[in-house]
């Protein structure tokens, strides 16, 4: 249990929905910063594949518990919930990064390849949570094949 009174939480966040949205917002900012730092010295043409190295390291970390967005959104039925808005923003961020990276890599169809890499990422995270980090390594192998054409 948190050492905080419910009234204090509502005073700070306004509602339970805003508390959940604030949690996801923090998680997305942290993830973006981690990814950007990890890829900073990688040429844009190699970032899509290098991203999967980051995924493998994350899945192998002792703190790995899967994707906070997937966990949280799976519990929300309201499409307008503020946490869903945060989650959709993060998904759009990933999609745009993959489009940038696949374009820089010179693949034949960067948009379709970017969508496929998002699916691989989703599977890597969900699979690693259930089966262990080998699933992230499998996704990296598949990403390499996909990017090679």
PLM region spans:
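Helix-turn-helix
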Residues: 1-18
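Alpha-helical DNA-contacting segments of helix-turn-helix folds
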Residues: 13, 20-27
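Hydrophobic alpha-helical connector segments
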Residues: 22, 33-65, 114-117
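Amphipathic, non-transmembrane alpha-helical scaffold segments
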Residues: 24, 28, 84-92
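An amphipathic alpha-helix signature
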Residues: 32, 49, 92-99, 140, ...
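Amphipathic alpha-helical segments used for helix-helix packing
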Residues: 61-82
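Hydrophobic/aromatic-rich alpha-helical bundle segments in the mid-to-C-terminal region
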Residues: 82-89, 103-147
């Amino acid at each position: 249990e948190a050492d905080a009174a419910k009234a204090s939480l509502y005073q700070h966040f306004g509602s339970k929905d805003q508390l959940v949205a604030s949690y996801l917002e923090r998680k997305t900012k942290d993830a973006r910063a981690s990814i950007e730092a990890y890829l900073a010295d990688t040429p844009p043409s190699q970032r899509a594949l290098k991203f999967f190295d980051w995924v493998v390291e994350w899945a192998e970390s002792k703190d790995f518990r899967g994707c906070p967005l997937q966990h949280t959104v799976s519990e929300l039925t309201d499409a307008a919930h503020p946490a869903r808005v945060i989650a959709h923003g993060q998904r759009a961020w990933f999609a745009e990064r993959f489009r940038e990276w696949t374009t820089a890599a010179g693949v034949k169809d960067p948009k379709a390849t970017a969508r496929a890499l998002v699916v691989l990422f989703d599977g890597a995270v969900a699979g690693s949570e259930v089966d262990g980090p080998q699933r992230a390594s499998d996704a990296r192998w598949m990403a390499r094949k996909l990017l090679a054409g």
